[in-house]
Amino acid sequence: IEDNRVINRAPLLNASLTQPATGVFSGVFTNSYGGNVSPDFTGNIRIDQKTFTAQLSGAAHNIHANYYAGPGGIAPVETNGHPDDVWGFAVMGGLQLKELPTGPGDKLSLDITYVDGAVKYLIGGVTGSSFDAFSGGTNFAGSYNGMAVLSLLDGVYTTGSHIEKTKGWGFRGGFLHNW
């Protein structure tokens, strides 16, 4: 069982709320979770041997929305109702190969993750609403300045609709060589 407070989850976007047009793109918007009604349920199965370690993990995550926005995008109120709760999930698998012929203590690690409405399990440490990167210059020919913005959401809904969960996947790998 894992704590599901706001700091431990990605936001939920009520796209019907009146907010600056740049809000969705800059990551500055109201988190529309309706509170914490259930912890996340997590588990894993792990095999640890001399030559390899393998692990399969999973998580179930409740998405509980705030009330629908009123006419013209005004603040949500109880009489407007809200979308039904939905459950998001994550599935992760990992493999680490040890005792490699490249040298003592060398390891090759690989993992893959799929999420549907539980983005924090894909990009750990989601503690806000966005990722922003700004660059004053690059070494690439023809480029001037750069900017990247990524809003990490568990889902999106509008007035009268259901929650559309965010889906994502990730693949990571690493090689440790002892010199």
For each of these PLM feature ranges, what is it?
Residues 1-89:
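Aromatic- and glycine-enriched pocket-lining scaffold segments that form the walls
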Residues 50-179:
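Detector for outer-membrane/organellar transmembrane beta-barrel domains
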